[in-house]
Amino acid sequence: MYAALALMFGAAIYLSVRAPSAHLRSVPPGFVRASGTRFVVDGRAFRFVGANVAVMYKDEDRAAMPETLREAALDGIKVVRVWASGEGTEENGVLSVGGDRADWPRKHPFRRAPDDWNEEAFVHLDHVLAEARRNNLHVQLCLVNWWRDTGGVTQYLRWAGIDDAADEHYKFGVNPERAMLFYTNETTRRLYREHVARIVMRRNTVTGILYRDDPTLFGYELMNEAQAPTGREAERRAWIEEMSAYIKSLDANHLITPGMWGYRSAYERREWLAVHSLPNIDYCDVHNYPRDDLDSFVDSPAALREFIDNRAAAAFSINKPLVFGEFGMSPDGYKGAAQVDWFRAYFDAAAHAGVGGAMFWILTPDPQRGYGITYKDVRDEQMRAELVRAAGLFNSLSNAAPPAALLNAGQHLIPRQFAFTRAPNDEAAKPVLKIQTDNTLLYRFAPEQAVRGRFEKLDGGDGYVWGAGVGFFEYVVPARTDRRRVSEIVVRAHLQPVPPHDADGRADETRVTLFINGTNCGAKLAAMEHQPNAVIQEWHVKNLIPRYHAWRGHALTLRFAVETDADRPFGINISNFPEWFHAGETKPIEVEVRR
């Protein structure tokens, strides 16, 4: 029905100065620290191409670890991301689900059971850090996994007596509502802190250096892709605040990031900013896989550049650096663009946006690994050449300031929107006019008669139109040739929210603001209704400017909007009642111009 146009909007408040905390003023030599929107080492700007590296779990990966890190350094990589966690065993653990289980064997866990630590895994991590040091690489350590590949959150919960968080009926085998208990359960929090302390306070058996004193470490990632369903974000945020403070109490010098997937809506963006604004969080983190993450709408290299700009602007609005911790693309490419073209767009956009680091998934000795880039096969020679080129680009732009457009506080507030516009004077958009006995003009619109719409997701058809997230629908009352006294304009609309799929009843209201010819006429909280009763929102507009336009016979543009700062930004569904039922006398939208 509509021609969809992808539109981008912008971000938040840019702070020109961020006072460094006390622990950053005395960072020892060689440590990476955050300074405003960039990283620095010994006073010099530090930007990087980075890699997730397969060195921890499979026997062949562990054996090839020294070679993998050497090859990473040869490709110009400066930071590698390593998993410093693994819980449970093949025999009694929560195992990975899906087709890549072979990539995540549980032969070398860090912790077999709550009181059964595996020193051999820690010693291997010692060797990883020693080899990284030898190759002038920094290492980012990920301390636990939301997903089941390494045991992770669901294994901790099982140890706490909560078995139903691991459930094959859910995506990736994790019941998110039950897995949220990890953040609040006293036992899981204690077990996590025990693991953190063993990592941070460990003395490397190869180098003799305490991890907390080792400049080889880039920093700590609290969790891989920490999740929280809509409406339960505060539980995750409190956990991140607690654990980041705990790590800083043990190690004041290394960087900390929460380890979140990112955001895909204006609502999620707010929470992403709130988490990354916590005092012990040093930098922001985002992941993206265009083929798999369809809600990111990254369906072209150009869309990827827009995605990166938006996240960079969000990070800069709180004056912190941004790292893309994972980006993946399979060898066969996507949407007509080759793998190497996707990676070139990724690195170029990140470099020119002022991103601190751009990492990829995953450098591996295994040519068969999904999303893997291998140094063992000629297949990836072109990709490895791209890594070298990108590393040079990041080096050349080390001292470049972020683009001014990404520091504009009024832009980039919405990740992405889709829009439609009808042609002027489209007959299909004109309402039915009824003149009442008291000479009141009554205009009736069907939902699908909107002349314009713009939302984060968007659809419509006979008897309905809906938009998710923030945005608007507009309807136009046609101009008249007569003039008439107008005491008020009454607007009625059958409005409901469009809750996120994971809200589970926690997003059953949306804040809708009515504008008439640009004048704010007030907001209503529209709730999810339950049959058989329709709930109609009603505005009695006595504002002078809309009444003046109605008196002069001007066209009246009605905008039903969910604003970017709305307390309940959960879209608009305008429909006949019952929903999906098209009946001639239903009244989803009415406008009365009263004398």
Q: Where on the chain are the PLM-derived regions?
A:
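Hydrophobic membrane-insertion alpha-helices, especially the h-region
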Residues: 2-14
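Juxtamembrane cytosolic interface motif at the C-terminal end of transmembrane helices
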Residues: 13-18, 93
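Beta-strand-rich ligand-recognition modules
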Residues: 438, 446-459, 468-482, 494-588, ...
